[in-house]
Regions:
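Phosphate/pyrophosphate- and phosphate-bearing ligand-binding catalytic cores of soluble enzymes
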Residues: 167
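Rossmann-like NAD(P)(H) cofactor-binding subdomain of soluble oxidoreductases
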Residues: 25, 44-56, 60-129
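NAD(P)+-binding Rossmann beta1-loop-alpha1 motif at the extreme N-terminus of oxidoreductases
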Residues: 1-50, 124, 151
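Small-residue (G/A/S/T)-rich helix-start motifs and N-terminal tracts that mark the onset
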Residues: 1-2, 160-164
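Internal alpha-helical scaffold of NAD(P)-dependent oxidoreductase catalytic cores
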Residues: 92-110, 126-162, 173-175
């Protein structure tokens, strides 16, 4: 929710460009009250099929289940996967994305791991970003998106744990 709210407040996307999925009607209704122009659905597959950038913002224990649900419609040559799940490494994400699939072994997903903080919805986040199998253009795009929501810093994956600790508690120090 916080990422979608921040993106809708920025200049790069309109709420009508953003599809939000959730399991519960209650969560979707909360998003509708925030902005009635969000595209809201329970259907992760349909949302992923039509997306250029897929942000997986769920609890870490749900990541594999969500990826298993959507991976049959993913196009690794065109889509960017962004994970907000703390502690879910690139190796794990890649395994989830490619296991038990007919994907060409040469196709590798473009994956970003990000760790924003709650200030993202008011466009004041410090977001740590790490990239795997991403071109310079893709990396620049993701950095640009999250710079609009505060500040974004590209870091090596090995630093994401420290970034997670800083992003999740650093805002308390600023207050």
């Amino acid at each position: 929710g916080a990422i979608a709210r921040g993106l809708a407040k920025g200049t790069m996307f309109k709420a009508s460009d953003i599809t939000c999925t959730a399991q519960s009607d209650e969560t979707l209704e909360k998003m509708r009250k925030i902005d009635p122009d969000f595209i809201l659905t329970h259907d992760n597959v349909e949302a992923a099929r039509n997306a250029d950038i897929i942000i997986i913002a769920v609890k870490p224990w749900r990541v594999e289940m969500i990826i298993d649900e959507i991976k049959s419609v993913l196009d690794f040559e065109k889509q960017i996967i962004v994970s907000v799940a703390a502690g879910v490494t690139f190796d794990l994400l890649n395994t989830y994305l490619t296991k038990n699939t007919d994907f060409d072994c040469l196709a590798t997903p473009t994956i970003f791991r990000i760790m924003p903080n709650t200030a993202i919805e008011v466009m004041s986040s410090m977001t740590f970003v790490s990239a795997r199998n991403a071109s310079k253009e893709q990396t620049d795009l993701i950095i640009h998106i999250f710079n609009e929501l505060g500040n974004a810093m590209l870091v090596e994956e090995r630093l994401m744990g420290a970034g997670t600790a800083l992003a999740s508690s650093g805002i308390a120090f600023a207050l």
